[in-house]
Amino acid sequence: MRSTKTIHVISCHAEGEVGDVIVGGVAPPPGETLWEQRSFIARDQTLRNFVLNEPRGGVFRHVNLLVPPRHPEADAAFIIMEPEDTPPMSGSNSICVSTVLLDGGIVPMIEPITEMVLEAPGGLVRVKAECRNGKAERIFVQNVTSFADKLSVPLDVEGIGTLTVDTAYGGDSFVVVDAEALGFAIVEDEAKDIARLGVRITNAANEQLGFSHPENPDWNHISFCAFCGPLSQTPTGLTGRSAVAIQPGKVDRSPTGTAVSARMALMAARGQMTIGDTFEAVSIIGSSFTGRIVSQQMAGDRPGIVPEISGRGWITGIHQHMLDPSDPWPGGYKLSDTWGA
């Protein structure tokens, strides 16, 4: 076999959402901080194109790059590459990275509980894993500070009319809409319609509402649209279905950890949740993340929360992505039949 590039990947999913992990073959990108390294990858596009575009990738895939941590408290660091963005943080990808580190033997597993600190571009992520018989069975991720941004504001969406929406940050930035008011029960056969409408709503929110993180002015857009179903009370806390539309037009198969964090921040702002309360988010395929408010914390001048989300991850395979020097598409390709709403 001829190859000018070989990248070693352990494939994983967290509650249905793919989050592959690059464990070898890629040198750390330039940058003094993890955020600068993230920004280089986002600008350069070479690695993103190679692993996310067809024929090696696809719109369904997220890929995480393991890099040496820059923060002295961190045991490992990772940079998240999503189909159209290189975000500060991701809950499902944090679970995938933790699963690969522990189940793959990269970080020593201690049963029954392994604790470690990961560094994401958006900040430190404290992880606790419940482990048994060599398997990390459930991953608990203490997320970055999350906060409500705008509450109950109007948004005009062409072809729909005026919606009442919220915006919030949970490690990534969201416009949040009432799924039931738009006729969605958040079931599998609605995925295409949710994806298409979600992209339109996200684009409208960026044009009309905008977003700027109070401590990181580089993060100045709304990434996703979260369709949130009605809440119900259970003996252990609140529960509700949700679906997140991801650019350029797909639905997250998991409940989206950053969306769970953002939704809990909105509920805290409205007095529906407080410290210690839990929320079970159910995805479009029926998988779930459990969220909990750990504490209150400011994000710049914004009152916020420190959320914890938990879920499960599974390794699905080991791959070596290669580049034959005669391949006319070294950066791959993407077509509108799958890449775009």
UniProtKB/Swiss-Prot annotation:
Active-site residues (renumbered): 90 (proton acceptor)
Protein residues bound to substrate: 91-92, 252, 257-258
SS bonds (residue pairs): none
Recorded catalytic activity of this chain's protein: trans-3-hydroxy-L-proline = 1-pyrroline-2-carboxylate + H2O
E.C. numbers: 4.2.1.77
InterPro entries: Pro_racemase_fam
SUPFAM superfamilies reported for this sequence: Diaminopimelate epimerase-like
Residue runs in coiled coils: none
Pfam families xref list: Pro_racemase
Induction info: Is up-regulated when the bacterium is grown on t4LHyp or t3LHyp as sole carbon source.
Lyase among keywords: yes
Record's keyword terms, sorted: Lyase
Gene3D superfamilies in the cross-refs: Diaminopimelate Epimerase, Chain A, domain 1 (3.10.310.10)
GO molecular function, one term: 4-hydroxyproline epimerase activity
Homology family: Belongs to the proline racemase family.
Function of the molecule: Catalyzes the dehydration of trans-3-hydroxy-L-proline (t3LHyp) to Delta(1)-pyrroline-2-carboxylate (Pyr2C). May be involved in a degradation pathway of t3LHyp, which would allow L.aggregata to grow on t3LHyp as a sole carbon source. Displays neither proline racemase activity nor 4-hydroxyproline 2-epimerase activity.
Protein name in the entry: Trans-3-hydroxy-L-proline dehydratase
